Design a protein with these regions (language model features):
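Short, Lys/Arg-rich flexible segments
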Residues: 1-93, 110, 114, 118-164
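Cofactor-/ligand-binding subdomain signature composed of acidic, glycine-rich
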Residues: 106
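Membrane-proximal amphipathic alpha-helices
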Residues: 87, 95-98, 102
């Protein structure tokens, strides 16, 4: 199931994660694996995350409030790690010329993804949809099975190489 980790206030970034059953045990064992195995797992994880980022960027182009995603989309990036990771947000400023204090991508992520309009200060965002989201989370939910399958395949491929 997809979930959001808390906003990192130091770097203004949000992490999106997919949880898989049995990952904790695997990651514990991976810490003691040879460095070639760790490197291969990290590269495979980044490849999977890159595919998800491409899908998110495509979906962000067709949503009806795509102007808000123009600031967020360049900050979407895959991060190398033992599991597929995607970072969102950052300090890149929105391209609005009339405001003294322009919002950063990290400040727009949650409003553009989940909506607003319940408070006076969130009228610029689309209608609030609860946990559904508009671009990021629907993409993760749709690709959840693919992510799990590809990650499992990557791990099996690495373990087959080690067993030789």
């Amino acid at each position: 199931m997809a979930r959001v980790r808390p906003l990192d206030t130091r770097t203004n970034q949000t992490r999106v994660a997919v949880e898989m059953f049995g990952m904790d045990e695997f990651l514990r064992e991976l810490r003691f694996a040879p460095s070639e195995v760790k490197k291969a797992v990290k590269q495979g994880s980044k490849e999977i995350a890159d595919k998800v980022v491409v899908e998110m960027k495509q979906r962000a182009r067709i949503v009806w409030h795509q102007e808000q995603y123009e600031t967020i989309v360049p900050s979407l990036r895959a991060v190398q790690g033992t599991v597929p990771k995607i970072k969102i947000g950052g300090a890149r400023k929105a391209a609005v010329g009339r405001r003294k204090r322009r919002p950063s991508a990290g400040e727009l992520v949650m409003g553009a993804e989940f909506g607003g309009r319940r408070e006076e200060t969130t009228q610029q965002f689309p209608i609030h949809r609860g946990r559904k989201g508009y671009v990021l989370f629907p993409t993760i939910r749709r690709l959840h099975g693919t992510i799990k399958k590809e990650y499992t395949d990557q791990i099996e491929k690495v373990l087959r190489k080690v067993a030789r």
